[in-house]
Amino acid sequence: MSASGLPFDDFRELIRNLPGPDLGAERAVREREVTLTKPAGSLGRLEEIVAWLATWTGKRTPQVNRPLVAVFAGNHGVTAKNITPFPPSVTAQMVENFAAGGAAINQICIANDLGLKVFDLALEHPTGDITEEAAMDERTCAATMAFGMEAIAGGTDLLCIGEMGIGNTTIAAAIALALFGGTAEDWVGPGTGSTGELMQRKLAAVRQAVALHQPHLQDPLEVLRCLGGREIAAMAGAILAARMEKIPVIVDGFVASAAAAVLYAANPEAIDHCMFGQVSAEPGHRKLLAKMGKEPLLDLGMRLGEGTGAALAANIVKAAALCHSGMATFEQAGVSASK
């Protein structure tokens, strides 16, 4: 803990002093790229992806050998306001489904040869109802961020982050509204299927929560504490830990992007090592990516969460790395280069 004794101070210091890019590694990749057996620039965004990998791993021939999907699960007190068609018990049931191998993310990880870890964040103790009280106190929020930092403990060279939590698109919308302004209508979408009266209650909950906590919302970490969820705090911690350990990150959908947005609001450079795997069908996600100046890799109309979009995008990143490291140069292949 910091000398001040305030749990967030250590994180504020960390966010201010994150390691920067390795421009030498990026330059080496770009220099090799023009020697490979293809017209310059013909692999399009794959060439930018491998340069990004080099920049944040510090490796001049970046590889992806141990990709990991980390899924964080949390429950939310705001679901008591009847904002979603599914009960919060579904969160724990889906965690069991992940463990049994029966969810979409399990199949995508199998298809793409990705590791999978699922983190159950005190599901029996939902966060506070954000329309009535703060989601967490500072100590709990900081401890949850620290827990999320342990996601990389087993070793990985590409981290995909995702989540599971009934009610958490409401939480993500509240965070986005607090960080970037606008109206609740700008950020609130159907989530797991909220329409009609459910949607009206969801909109009202977001408005009420942001109004209630307004005096605290100038500080992004306070936004996370007041309006966030344990899975969102843990994802923010995982993103920070990955930066410290030179591990690139692929962020999944709207909720995972809300975790990244908290860090972005504190320091826009804090998520430079992050790529956004997809743009969700949840309407607020496209707006959120635009606010952060991020372009997603995929647009497949998905809105499941679970890290599914990030996991699909991981295969593109793996392919980019292999194209760069495995392709022959013009000289090696005896192919004539362009004049």
UniProtKB/Swiss-Prot annotation:
GO biological process: cobalamin biosynthetic process
Residues of the active site: 306
UniProt-listed Pfam families: DBI_PRT
Keywords, comma-separated and alphabetical: Cobalamin biosynthesis, Glycosyltransferase, Transferase
Purpose: Catalyzes the synthesis of alpha-ribazole-5'-phosphate from nicotinate mononucleotide (NAMN) and 5,6-dimethylbenzimidazole (DMB).
Similarity remark: Belongs to the CobT family.
Name of the protein in its database record: Nicotinate-nucleotide--dimethylbenzimidazole phosphoribosyltransferase
Gene source species: Brucella melitensis biotype 2 (strain ATCC 23457)
Top-level taxonomy: Bacteria, Pseudomonadati, Pseudomonadota, Alphaproteobacteria, Hyphomicrobiales
Gene that produces this protein: cobT
